[in-house]
Design a protein with these regions (language model features):
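Conserved, charged catalytic cores of large soluble enzymes
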Residues: 106-110, 173, 617-635
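C-terminal capping/lid segments that line or modulate ligand- or cofactor-binding pockets
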Residues: 204, 208, 272-273, 279, ...
């Protein structure tokens, strides 16, 4: 039976707080082959019985993944119900589904500049706020009349906040409102809170922390980067049965006081003094929660409503809870808690103590060669959490307004003897659905894939950060763009990246240059840091996040809305590069190039590949992607213009970086990788370039010496040019430098440096030695797309037409992967058994694929498929369903 599943809105199942009409999509499920949608009927209504229809449209189309409901008009702060019915052709004949289960989305304020009336209120003292990182609380009582039908709270803060109604935390969200360039864009969250209110007197309250807004942040460790006063704003809309609406807004009538959070910052952790608690403080006033002199009037803080933007999904919350594996005493006498996994988040403690006693932990990543806590790589970050008791009791507590990167926790203070049961790690990251899994016969590669995934989890906390542990944790654009494709294989990152790309665009400089970190917290401090002073923005491979990430998202999800929204930003970046060319080559200030490559001069972070070469390669790539985006959007004039820009950039690359006999002027691995991967090698010199890359690899005994820009593409540059064995050999290297070396050293996430920990247990320089740095995990895309073999046919997007091309090798007995696409799940497995290779493939309904076997494959089983040779490979065109074929290789 054919059914509709997973109706979504803007790639989310149940978004709350949309400020626009969403894009719709759905998936089909059926137990027969060749399912192809021919027609759909989409309805949107105000009630779950669909009696109050707002939209009812039937379309003859196969489109099921990026459907626009033209003519649908939405209202602010309203719940909507949607359902879809589908007609399809199948191998069993035409079929029609029943209506899908109703799916729900809720709108935010569609025009906050006009509709937002709430003021930002603060309980901080103007005399002390600039130096304070203490928390505060604000609250106010309000009355709800009988007949309440719905209630929606729109909330945000300058700083971090948790909001409560009648003593109950409104949501499980953490670290709200997230991190943006607050002076340009501030997100607000929308919550349906009907069930939390009752007729009569109610109480609203919020607790605030310094967060990214005013705490110490950035390479210069500056504070008050966006302002010096935390403030909270709430606009609570009450909708009554008769249709009338009223609002409860923050304003001067609210009251404030100090919170038991006496200190909280992103880098340094949090301290909590239970003596300052007010029990039931966010409930209606009692003598207990309203002691004389404790609450005082708030003051208002101006903020333009026009800069507010709704956040409907992708918010940070506790995604996993990991119990401690052991508590042990290190050789130096330190008491250490081990959670067995490097991660980002907090530690929840359950502890018994008496008044004045404290429980204090310091989170860290690694043990040194002697088995003692290794803290040096945290630099100035204190990463400490402390709870001080007010009376004799047992408490369960975790920080609210900070997070740490850690596997271990050093017990600094503890009443009694700590046991594993006292500690639970709470993993924090932005909400994302899993999108794929890769496994193979080599356990070390499986652990590598695990490490890559945990690098994503640890660094996708509202923004794509470089690392979660030290005093940095910034949204480096280069790291983000090189990891983006891998991230999309692992998780549904559409919402996460879409949010961050808006931040990138608003932080773009007037000349079109892109900041090296987004949000650009460093923009007013560049003179205080050597790197930022010499390379304040416009770094190739970093700024190209403006073009690469939107294009990758379009390719992976097939939704051109990301190109439409980001196209002005993409164009400004390419025009910035065009305006800063000298003799045909992009040249702007100091460039970072192949950052931390192993072929760098001793003591330098700059790889041996000339930055002029890496800059020109990315200039050509970005111009090409912009031309392709313009083509998708129907902008023929721009498509032709930037195609010419790309051709000229490629010609200038060849003229400057190839000699007359076809040798590259830079004899580095990265130079050859980028030339091949970006299509910048003149065809007549392609084989020579491939051969020279193999020679450079052999000179290093099969090891890479590449940095940030070369490493992500190394395996693909080999395999896509026929060098499969070398690609597998590179991936499977077990000694330094290589991906599996880290695994054998006990890594549970990907490291910043290939030798972060050396075989003798000594460490790389503590100044830059993160053990949770996802950049080199970009090789994950190769595992899914090349090793397992799930790819797309040229000229397509969103996996409407896949190319399933398994390529056994490397001595692996089997490999398998699945990937969740807008159409549903693709799965591919290959297995080698005594010379026989068996391939099992699954294609979701309404999609199609080509199964492309290895050149020289001699078919044994075809499962009814017809294979014909294409480009030297036995190839079969298939529609949805499950297939199993087998073959041997001709000798």
């Amino acid at each position: 039976m054919l059914t509709v599943t997973g109706l979504w809105f803007d790639h989310e199942r149940t978004p709350v707080g949309l400020d626009h009409t969403p894009v719709f999509g759905w998936q089909l499920e059926g137990n027969c082959r060749n399912i192809r949608q021919t027609q759909y009927r989409l309805q949107v209504a105000l009630t779950p019985d669909f009696a109050a229809l707002l939209y009812d449209e039937t379309c003859e189309t196969g489109n099921s993944t990026a459907v626009h409901a033209a003519g649908l008009t939405l209202q602010s702060l309203q719940k909507y119900y949607a359902r879809v019915q589908v007609w399809a052709d199948t191998a069993a004949g035409p079929q029609q589904t029943l209506w899908s289960e109703p799916a729900v989305f809720i709108t935010a304020l569609l025009d906050p500049a006009a509709e937002w009336k709430a003021e930002f209120v603060s309980a901080e003292s103007p005399e002390t706020c600039r130096k304070s990182s203490a928390g505060t609380m604000v609250r106010a009582a309000f009355t709800v009349k009988p007949g309440l039908r719905a209630a929606y709270a729109c909330t945000t803060a300058l700083g971090l906040y948790n909001v409560y109604l009648n003593g109950q935390k409104v949501s499980t969200d953490e670290m709200t409102p997230g991190w943006t360039s607050y002076n340009r864009r501030l997100l607000y969250q929308t919550y349906e809170v009907t069930a939390m209110l009752h007729p009569g007197l109610n109480m609203a309250g919020a607790m605030l922390g310094a967060g990214w807004y005013k705490g110490v942040m950035g390479l210069t460790r500056s504070r008050n980067n966006y302002g010096d006063t935390t403030a909270f704003a709430m606009q609570l809309t009450l909708v009554y049965a008769d249709g009338t609406r009223e609002t409860v807004n923050t304003g001067p009538a609210w009251q404030g006081t100090k919170a038991p959070v006496i200190f909280s910052e992103i880098y340094h952790g949090e301290a909590y003094d239970a003596a300052l608690e007010l029990p039931h403080w966010a409930e209606c006033e009692t003598p207990e929660n309203t002691p004389a002199g404790r609450w005082h009037a708030v003051h208002t803080v101006p903020y333009p409503a026009a800069k507010l933007a709704a956040q409907a999904a992708g918010k940070v919350c506790v995604q996993q809870r990991i119990p401690a594996q052991r508590v042990f005493t290190a050789p130096d006498g330190s008491i250490v808690v081990d959670f067995g996994q490097n991660m980002a988040g907090r530690v929840e403690i359950t502890v018994q103590g008496t008044a004045g006693q404290a429980a204090e932990l310091r989170c860290f990543e690694e043990l040194d060669a002697d088995g003692n806590p290794y803290l040096a790589n945290l630099r100035k970050a204190r990463t400490t959490m402390q709870y001080t008791f007010a009376r004799s009791q047992t408490v369960t507590w975790q920080p609210q307004f900070t997070y740490m990167g850690f596997r271990y926790a050093l017990v600094v203070q503890w009443p009694g003897k700590p046991e594993p049961a006292n500690f639970t790690a709470c993993v924090l990251h932005s909400a994302m659905q899993p999108a794929g899994e890769f496994t193979c016969s080599e356990p070390l590669v499986n652990q590598l894939n695990h490490n890559i995934l945990w690098g994503l989890k640890s660094n996708f906390l509202d923004v794509p950060t470089d690392c979660p542990q030290r005093d940095e944790r910034l949204g480096w654009t280069g790291d983000a763009q090189i990891f983006c494709e891998t991230a999309c294989w692992l998780a549904d990152t559409w919402t996460f990246y879409s949010k961050w790309l808006k931040d990138l665009a608003v932080d773009q400089l007037p000349d079109g240059g892109v900041a090296n970190v987004v949000p650009n917290i460093e923009e007013t401090h560049t003179e205080a840091n050597w790197l930022m002073k010499n390379c304040p923005y416009g770094a190739s491979g970093w700024g190209d996040a403006a073009t690469v990430i939107p294009w990758v998202l379009y390719q992976m999800y097939g939704d051109d809305t990301i190109l439409r929204s980001q196209y002005p930003s993409m164009k400004r970046w390419v025009d910035f590069m065009r305006a800063n060319t000298q003799n045909g080559l992009f040249d702007f200030k100091m460039q970072l190039g192949d950052w931390v490559a192993l072929d760098a001069e001793p003591g330098s972070y700059f790889g041996a590949t000339p930055t002029a070469l890496t800059s020109q390669a990315y200039y050509a790539l970005s111009a090409q992607l912009l031309a392709l985006a313009a083509e998708v959007l129907g902008n023929r004039q721009d498509a032709e213009l930037y195609a010419r820009v790309h051709r000229q950039a490629a010609q200038d690359f060849a003229a400057n970086f190839f000699t007359l006999d076809g040798a590259m002027t830079a004899q580095t691995q990265t130079a050859h990788i980028l030339a091949l991967r970006f299509g910048l090698t003149p065809q007549k010199w392609k084989q020579k370039t491939i051969q020279r890359l193999l020679e450079l690899l052999e000179q290093q005994n099969g090891h890479l010496v590449t940095g940030f820009l070369g490493t992500p593409y190394f395996c693909a540059a080999l395999s896509q040019n026929g060098c499969w064995q070398q690609a597998y050999d590179l991936m499977l290297k077990k000694d330094y430098p290589g991906w599996l070396y880290q695994v054998l050293q006990g890594a549970t996430t990907v490291w910043e440096h290939w030798d972060g920990r050396r075989p003798d247990g000594t460490m790389w320089s503590a100044g830059m030695n993160s053990f949770n740095h996802y950049a080199y995990g970009a090789v994950g895309a190769w595992l899914y797309g090349e090793c397992a073999g799930i790819g797309q046919q040229p000229g397509t997007a969103g996996f409407c037409a896949a190319r399933l091309a398994p390529r056994p090798g490397g001595g692996l007995r089997w490999a398998q992967a699945w990937h969740q696409t807008p159409f549903g799940r693709y799965a591919l497995q290959w297995q080698v058994d005594d010379g026989k290779i068996t391939v099992t493939a699954a294609i979701p309904p309404n999609a199609a694929a080509k199964i492309c076997l290895e050149p020289g494959a001699k078919l044994l089983e075809t499962d009814g498929l017809t294979f014909a040779e294409q480009n030297g490979c036995p190839t079969a065109q298939v529609s949805s369903g499950q297939y199993r074929v087998s073959y041997t290789m001709e000798q």
